[in-house]
């Protein structure tokens, strides 16, 4: 929005041309979203408290979690508001990738909002039934996949790239739709499973989102893409503004979500942020790198799959409780220790993901 205004004002003063720079608008995206989250956060927390929109805590979980009962939830609406406003202000609104990521993020946020609403407001412990949740996730995930497939100008944008094997490119054809669906929906649910401790999900999301922003910037620049042997995706660089907004909104939310949390993001935030990461990774053809950098999300998801499969097949549980962060809590790890160690793991994995840029 402001980019269009700056382009108009260039005829009066050339200084407004500075807003053409992606890096500047990415930084402004961070600062705008961060400011909005910090400004609106206290008001949202008070509103949630007044409306008694509080988190219910499982009785079979760690006893330390009982004190969290009643903590305001659905704070993900704060994150999504800050991301949306910042992106609409600073991004090029003629760029199709910006709209795809933004719409997918808000659509999955809407699914999470309905789920949270039924749990908290309607006092329905099941929330949105799983079959309906996955149905709507599938609808929006497939819609995004089909749109990206149908509008791809070159086969590069539907080719699977393997890090460290950059000479190997696997044309997916219509299989791109299937892969994209699983990446978006899988990433959405993986972040949601991770969101069980104060700040546990949001900081890895911020770090992975920041790294994906770097991939977006490099993939959108033909010279960098050719030098690094990564897919050149025209227009992908504009997503650095969205990634910047995600970083700012995430850090602003973490200000209130850090241990002991004043607010939880709820499904409205977790499902949306996971879907955003998955969609961005698909656009820049870095699904495998997302799998690496989001290793904490993958680990949390696998722990649930293993736990359920083991119990159904043998009647025994592999972990004391799943997702795996609860397993470590029940082993006696204090909550802050689990959180920070998972953050450290994410830092290492993100660095490995970024290192694939130079590995041939």
Curated annotation (Swiss-Prot):
Pathway, per Swiss-Prot/TrEMBL? Cell wall biogenesis; peptidoglycan biosynthesis
**What organism does the record attribute this protein to?**
Pseudomonas entomophila (strain L48)
GO molecular function term, any single one: metal ion binding
What does the record say about its membrane topology?
A: Multi-pass membrane protein
Q: Which NCBIfam families match?
A: mraY (TIGR00445)
Q: Which InterPro entries match?
A: Glycosyl_transferase_4, PNAcMuramoyl-5peptid_Trfase, PNAcMuramoyl-5peptid_Trfase_CS
Q: Which EC class, in a word? A: transferase
Q: Name one GO cellular component term.
A: plasma membrane
Name its cellular compartments. Cell inner membrane
Q: Which UniProt keywords apply?
A: Cell cycle, Cell division, Cell inner membrane, Cell membrane, Cell shape, Cell wall biogenesis/degradation, Magnesium, Membrane, Metal-binding, Peptidoglycan synthesis, Transferase, Transmembrane, Transmembrane helix
Q: One Pfam annotation, family name? A: MraY_sig1
Kindly provide the name given to this protein in its UniProt entry.
Phospho-N-acetylmuramoyl-pentapeptide-transferase
Q: Which CDD domains match?
A: GT_MraY
Q: Name one GO biological process term.
A: peptidoglycan biosynthetic process
Q: According to the UniProt entry, what is the EC number of this protein?
A: 2.7.8.13
Cofactor(s) of this protein = Mg(2+)
Any keyword Secreted? no
Record field: catalytic activity: UDP-N-acetyl-alpha-D-muramoyl-L-alanyl-gamma-D-glutamyl-meso-2,6-diaminopimeloyl-D-alanyl-D-alanine + di-trans,octa-cis-undecaprenyl phosphate = di-trans,octa-cis-undecaprenyl diphospho-N-acetyl-alpha-D-muramoyl-L-alanyl-D-glutamyl-meso-2,6-diaminopimeloyl-D-alanyl-D-alanine + UMP
